[in-house]
């Protein structure tokens, strides 16, 4: 993206399910490289620690914090447990706009779709971000369906479901080309219908 500077600060190890947990005391960090070869800072702590290290130790002054793209969708009752969303919530508490993006698991993980969603959102909201008027009341959470057939449908904004039904596997959408009989009313229904779900998540859950 032209005119955009990306600073990578992330946990050194997988910290799935750690919510907005933070480490007491000093958090160690060191130079690191992502799996795709991008230089950044590896934080020996939780995702929310990475936000604190970026702001307080490295002196980063971001217009936006982007957390993800995570492997595994974070919808319904999974959202409060998510380290990806937890880092974004930590940014909100510091007055910084934040996005969280999550995709599927294994072969169904469409990271490209997640990254594209983030890039399109940044482009659409660039003026607000640079002007300091972007909202900081909620995290904008993106979830990409794990399509085994077809490709994700349009972006749809929906609220968070209370819980994932016991018989539903949100990590896999069998056929994203099928059109649901009714419009989705929450993030779980959106994923299972093959839609790219956008959901507002408050800082406190």
List where the protein language model places each region.
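A cross-family phosphate/adenosyl-ligand binding-site feature
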Residues: 2-50, 60-61
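Active-site-proximal beta-strand/loop segments in catalytic clefts of secreted hydrolases
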Residues: 9-13, 44-45, 68-71, 101-105, ...
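Extracytoplasmic/secreted cell-surface and envelope-processing proteins
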Residues: 16-18, 74-78, 108-111, 151
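Alpha-helix C-terminal capping segments
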Residues: 54-60, 86-97
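Charged helix-capping and loop-helix junction motifs
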Residues: 80-86
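Glycine-rich phosphate/pyrophosphate-binding loops
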Residues: 92-114
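Electrostatically charged, flexible surface regions
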Residues: 113-205
């Amino acid at each position: 993206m032209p005119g955009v500077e990306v600073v990578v600060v992330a946990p050194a190890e997988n910290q799935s399910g750690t919510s907005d947990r933070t480490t007491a005391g000093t958090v160690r960090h060191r130079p690191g490289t992502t799996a795709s070869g991008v230089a950044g800072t590896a934080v020996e702590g939780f995702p929310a620690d990475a936000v604190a290290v970026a702001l307080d130790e490295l002196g980063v002054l971001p217009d936006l914090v982007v957390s993800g793209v995570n492997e595994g969708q974070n919808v319904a009752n999974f959202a409060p447990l998510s380290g990806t969303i937890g880092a974004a919530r930590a940014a909100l508490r510091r007055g910084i706009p934040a996005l969280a993006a999550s995709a599927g698991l294994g072969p169904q993980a469409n990271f490209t779709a997640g990254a594209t969603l983030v890039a399109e959102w940044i482009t659409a909201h660039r003026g607000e971000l640079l002007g300091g008027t972007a909202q900081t009341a909620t995290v904008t959470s993106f979830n990409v369906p794990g399509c085994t057939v077809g490709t994700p449908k349009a972006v749809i904004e929906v609220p968070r479901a209370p819980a994932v039904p016991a018989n539903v596997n949100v990590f896999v959408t069998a056929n994203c080309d099928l059109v649901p009989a009714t419009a989705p009313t929450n993030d779980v229904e959106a994923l299972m219908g093959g839609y790219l779900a956008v959901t507002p998540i408050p800082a406190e859950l």
